[in-house]
Amino acid sequence: VLSDEDKTNVKTFWGKIGTHTGEYGGEALERMFLSFPTTKTYFPHFDLSHGSGQIKAHGKKVADALTRAVGHLEDLPGTLSELSDLHAHRLRVDPVNFKLLSHCLLVTLSSHLREDFTPSVHASLDKFLSSVSTVLTSKYR
């Protein structure tokens, strides 16, 4: 459960990402594919080479979904319901992949926004991404 401080940290930090959300989302995806090659199995139709337009486009989709979630921290289940259905029933993504992508996103964000990525912000973002992962895997049961 996100505390009021967590919510403030997440909203404030996410606001500092600005127009880079898509760029950072794509970088996090590419980082995940390189670090955890088994995650590539869900993207057989993608060009997975460095700088791929498909990775960038999907990274933007991921980042846009997270931006929506940041705007609706009080109702993550409602905000992410369609994505949860899609990943559980149609795409059948292994739930562990959400944790892997969350980790790669934290690494990416910390590398770009070092000054703002304090231990407190790190903890809040980790809790936020964990909450998102929990919602996205809720329809698997």
Swiss-Prot record:
Keyword Membrane recorded: no
Organism: Trichechus inunguis
UniProt signal peptide: none
Highest taxon above the source species: Eukaryota
PTM sites of type Phosphoserine: S3, S35, S49, S102, S124, S131, S138
Domain Globin: 1-141
Residues bound to O2: H58
Protein name (database record): Hemoglobin subunit alpha
Residues with N6-succinyllysine modification: K7, K11, K16, K40
Family: Belongs to the globin family.
Keywords: Acetylation, Heme, Iron, Metal-binding, Oxygen transport, Phosphoprotein, Transport
BP term (GO), one: hydrogen peroxide catabolic process
Gene symbol of the encoding locus: HBA
Residues that bear N6-acetyllysine: K16
Keyword Ion transport assigned: no
Tissues expressing the protein: Red blood cells.
Function recorded in the entry: Involved in oxygen transport from the lung to the various peripheral tissues.
